[in-house]
Amino acid sequence: MGIMDLFKKKSSGNVAKDRLKLVLVSDRANCSSEMMEMMKRDIIEVISRYMDIDAEALDVKITETESDSNNGMVPALVANIPIRDMKHRPDPR
């Protein structure tokens, strides 16, 4: 895969396939959409104590990753959190 492959637009079929994979992995991890939203709110609350983030652009999902211990695929929580700025003094809560 070359660097230019990163900028190619995915076909709607590939996008749908990726979404279905995420749904299946989330289902296997027994994680409902309500649970994902609760985790997202908690992550925003904790991270916001230390940095200014773009909460609207925050993306949290469950994917699969290779396990080091049993050579199989395991669920992994992945968070993409756009940081605007670091806070010089963390908010005490």
Swiss-Prot record:
Keywords: Cell cycle, Cell division. It holds the Pfam family MinE. SUPFAM superfamilies: Cell division protein MinE topological specificity domain (SSF55229). One of its GO terms (biological process) is regulation of division septum assembly. InterPro entries: MinE, MinE_sf. The keyword RNA-binding does not apply. It comes from the Bacteria. The keyword Ribosomal protein does not apply. Belongs to the MinE family. NCBIfam families: minE (TIGR01215), PRK00296.1 (NF001422). Prevents the cell division inhibition by proteins MinC and MinD at internal division sites while permitting inhibition at polar sites. This ensures cell division at the proper site by restricting the formation of a division septum at the midpoint of the long axis of the cell. This is Cell division topological specificity factor. The gene is minE.
